[in-house]
Amino acid sequence: MQFDYIIIGAGSAGNVLATRLTEDPNTTVLLLEAGGPDYRFDFRTQMPAALAFPLQGKRYNWAYETEPEPFMNNRRMECGRGKGLGGSSLINGMCYIRGNALDLDNWAQEPGLENWSYLDCLPYYRKAETRDVGENDYHGGDGPVSVITSKPGVNPLFEAMIEAGMQAGYPRTDDLNGYQQEGFGPMDRTVTPHGRRASTSRGYLDQAKSRPNLTIRTHAMTDHIIFDGKRAVGVEWLEGDSTIPTRAAANKEVLLCAGAIASPQILQRSGVGNAELLAEFDIPLVHELPGVGENLQDHLEMYLQYECKEPVSLYPALQWWNQPRIGAEWLFGGTGVGASNHFEAGGFIRSREEFAWPNIQYHFLPVAINYNGSNAVKEHGFQCHVGSMRSPSRGHVRIKSRDPHQHPGILFNYMSHEQDWQEFRDAIRITREIMHQPALDQYRGREISPGVECQTDEQLDEFVRNHAETAFHPCGTCKMGYDEMAVVDGEGRVHGLEGLRVVDASIMPQIITGNLNATTIMIGEKIADMIRGKEALPRSTAGYFVANGMTVRAKK
């Protein structure tokens, strides 16, 4: 089998590349996905309100686990990643947050990455998006990804929480992806107008999969990339339960889009990475790149949960006797409780003036429950998910064997810097202050978690050690740049090799301020133009907010 391009991973970026490259009818593409199809009849992945279900099983989730995290009381922590057409866009929380403009301007400070500034990237965010309330300088109107924004009147808790943030002195913003990210406001979400999850499989692959020049193989577990000297010339994979490898040749390039956990794994198994690690497993060295699998970053978050004094939370939706009606309303009408992920409000703040742009993110949820659906509080409640955005902690991903089915060693080194502890203490105390504003007086009951007895630095730190969880945003393990730990250049091309790119969240040099999916899709769009030799979209001229030393919040 021969193709112009072989794409490994049909996820948030891989599906973008498959769709854009096959727009040229003379270009042939093989798309390999280790998981299965995104079954449209499976409510677990298609119903926004069911977002916790895929994280509870292994059909759509790699369900990785970290090594014992040394600063988190040696907990082994969850590291869910999407498996199936759509990748993590098939199982994520559907929050469409691009990050802060200054995140990208910060990337562009690195020599060789100058064209990754916010204004260079904004046209690609817009190209990918169709927003339900119409296009403008910041939002697209005819892209493959359906984005809906929260409307007033969904649940009184959302407006009360935004109002409470303002009463605490923080700004309101009507668009967390627009001129000003900083502040509290409605959340954009990747949901279709018919109340279905808008994964990249639905948005991109649906328009491309019938093209004769695109071949899609599911249940295809990539073993390694085949090299001829320093040139990537093909891929070898295992299909289904078979132990006999299948091969295909790439006439032009191999495009690795397997995500921040699997992409470095595949490079290491293919002989690209730290020479000492590869020698441990008798893997012939193709090219030494010590940065492969290093620079691992994530967002850590925790929940502050409160009893709700009025019966306006989603607690009744968790009762089994209400779920058939909710399911029917969603299935036949695309409406009701099932048609939302219920992260309809959130915000970004600076906890201290020394941060040039927001370092704390909020997601508001009108029910008290863990992200993966466990430990639901058996009463009306609500919660804030809160976490720091740009932790200095760094971890790694390293293979444990040559077997592609064996999970790698993953260590995030969560909370390994004093800055981490300071940010989380600040975040808990600020959140409590917001929760005690007048706007929430009629709703706020007792604090369920952490509980009012948890007050000192030592008590807060212990709560974080025991209860903080991943926000499922790993990135950075094949970072873009030109220093000695960089893996790819500014076009995703692997240093020192030919015919091989990495295009996914692993190439982010530094994690962004917000959820990763929108930016991963943007990366796919931007590098697709580079691969095709197309001129980059014209740089945007839109303005954007820079705090520039402004006070963190208005004085009361």
Curated annotation (Swiss-Prot):
Catalytic machinery residues: H473 (proton acceptor)
GO BP annotations, alphabetical order: glycine betaine biosynthetic process from choline
Catalysis performed (reactions): choline + A = betaine aldehyde + AH2; betaine aldehyde + NAD(+) + H2O = glycine betaine + NADH + 2 H(+)
Keyword terms: FAD, Flavoprotein, NAD, Oxidoreductase
Cofactor(s) the protein requires to work: FAD
EC nos: 1.1.99.1, 1.2.1.8
Top-level taxonomic group: Bacteria
Gene Ontology cellular-component terms listed: membrane
GO MF, any single term: betaine-aldehyde dehydrogenase (NAD+) activity
Gene3D superfamilies per UniProt: FAD/NAD(P)-binding domain, Glucose Oxidase, domain 3
Pathway(s) where this gene product acts: Amine and polyamine biosynthesis; betaine biosynthesis via choline pathway; betaine aldehyde from choline (cytochrome c reductase route): step 1/1
Annotated binding of FAD, by residue: 4-33
The keyword Flavoprotein is annotated on this UniProt entry: yes
Pfam families for the chain: GMC_oxred_C, GMC_oxred_N
Functional summary from the UniProt entry: Involved in the biosynthesis of the osmoprotectant glycine betaine. Catalyzes the oxidation of choline to betaine aldehyde and betaine aldehyde to glycine betaine at the same rate.
Membership in a protein family: Belongs to the GMC oxidoreductase family.
PANTHER family, alphabetized: CHOLINE DEHYDROGENASE, MITOCHONDRIAL, GLUCOSE-METHANOL-CHOLINE GMC OXIDOREDUCTASE
Name this protein carries in UniProt: Oxygen-dependent choline dehydrogenase
Species in which this protein is naturally found: Escherichia coli O6:K15:H31 (strain 536 / UPEC)
Source taxonomy: Bacteria, Pseudomonadati, Pseudomonadota, Gammaproteobacteria, Enterobacterales
